[in-house]
């Protein structure tokens, strides 16, 4: 492990040289994984993506190429926020990997306005693609730069705003997302009003009535704040109780931008990327999220981490990244045997616009329905195919007969195994 850690930078630089070219996209995101022990100096309490409140955790970031192939990883203390990791990635792309022109893609919580201004804007050749948060979208509507009423279907439109003079803004509208958010808001507001009514009742009971302006406010925040709907209510809290009323104007204002999101891009000219390409580039962050799911769940399982020294923890995460690098390439090669959609470009071309979700290609739908490949052979998940390949073993045989030397013998591959080995470009001497 120490041997591997000492060579991490050299290995990552080699991967970058192979897969990151001048002007390419570099996808970056951060996740966390929790700790059971308490002696690792990196393990701190922070925002848990695993929903493990109160547990110590570490954070680690993953830098990938535009297809989601891992290039580099970095471990951070568990209390380090997403934006505070951006500077090191920008430095890595420019200095360690030697890229003179690159586009860093990160989500709205990662590439905040402060990080763009302080860490990216002054770096020549380093462009960025991200998205605006909800508050910023509202501000654009209020200043008149964005007009939601002009959209009635899936749509993409580039706008300009004096608030972002050196950036390109692309408004996207997704009616399906609009409907989903509206339904979710109705559901959350119903729960919010139910909880508020319960607390209000507690302040009015005859015995042990809940009293105290601060106590009532704290309980409201504790029991109701998690639904994030208090912004739509006007609360009047007194020492002996409180009243609440729905703010319909606030609800209407939020509903007006349901289904809208805005992509922001800096230092990217229109002749380099069209509006739709900016949208598709941002959506490629889902490839990093897919990598995190693989690293943290069924296939690789990054935890539990049985290390406490920083160097060993960093080596452990790096080893997991390298394992995912191998798995990524295996899945690419074995795609004809899996349920993988091999015609994603065809499916993308069938969309009305880039804001519309990508449906499965006709061939992928056929795969899912018939569960066979184009030659009628049964398809597999990656996990079941790996179980099948585990049946191929190499035995070292020592005969009990004097004079006969030790020899090795491999399992003769079955048809499915043979097909997989051929796709992977591997030879078997099984007999």
Regions found by a protein language model. Give the residues of each.
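Anion-binding and metal-coordination hotspots
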Residues: 1-431
């Amino acid at each position: 492990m120490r041997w591997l850690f000492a060579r991490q930078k050299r290995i990552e630089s080699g991967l970058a040289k192979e897969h990151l070219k001048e002007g390419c996209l570099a996808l970056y995101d951060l996740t966390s994984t929790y700790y059971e022990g308490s002696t690792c100096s990196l393990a701190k309490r922070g925002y848990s993506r695993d929903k493990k409140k109160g547990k110590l955790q570490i954070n680690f970031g993953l830098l990938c190429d535009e297809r989601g192939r891992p290039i580099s990883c970095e471990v951070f203390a568990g209390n380090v926020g997403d934006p505070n990791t951006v500077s090191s990635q920008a430095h890595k792309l420019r200095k360690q990997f030697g890229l003179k022109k690159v586009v860093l893609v990160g989500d709205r919580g990662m590439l905040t306005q402060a990080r763009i201004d302080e860490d990216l804007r002054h770096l020549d050749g380093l462009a960025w693609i991200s998205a605006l948060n909800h508050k910023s979208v509202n501000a654009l509507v209020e200043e008149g730069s964005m007009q939601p009423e002009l959209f009635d279907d899936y749509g993409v439109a580039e706008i300009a705003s004096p608030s972002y003079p050196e950036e390109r803004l692309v408004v996207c509208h997704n009616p399906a997302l609009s409907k989903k958010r509206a339904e979710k808001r109705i559901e959350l507001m119903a729960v919010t009003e139910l909880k508020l009514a319960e607390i209000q009742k507690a302040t009015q009971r005859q015995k042990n009535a809940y009293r105290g302006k601060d106590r009532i406010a704290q309980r409201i925040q504790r029991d109701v704040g998690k639904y994030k709907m208090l912004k739509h209510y006007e609360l009047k809290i007194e020492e002996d109780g409180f009243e609440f009323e729905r703010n319909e104007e606030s609800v209407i204002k939020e509903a007006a931008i349901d289904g809208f999101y805005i992509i922001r891009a800096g230092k990217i000219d229109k002749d380099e990327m069209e509006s739709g390409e900016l949208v598709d580039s941002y959506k490629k962050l889902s490839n990093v999220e897919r990598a995190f799911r693989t690293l943290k769940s069924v296939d690789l399982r990054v935890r539990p981490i049985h290390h406490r020294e920083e160097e060993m923890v960093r080596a452990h995460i790096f080893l997991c990244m390298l394992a995912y690098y191998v798995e990524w390439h295996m899945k690419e090669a074995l795609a004809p045997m899996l349920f993988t959609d091999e015609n994603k470009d065809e499916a993308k071309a069938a969309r009305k616009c880039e804001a519309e979700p990508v449906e499965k290609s006709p061939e992928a739908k056929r795969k899912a329905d018939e569960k066979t490949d184009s030659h009628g052979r049964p398809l597999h998940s990656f996990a079941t195919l790996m179980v099948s390949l585990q049946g191929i073993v190499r035995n070292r045989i020592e005969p009990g007969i004097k004079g006969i030397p030790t020899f090795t013998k491999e399992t003769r591959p079955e048809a499915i195994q043979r097909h997989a080995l051929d796709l992977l470009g591997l030879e078997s001497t099984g007999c």
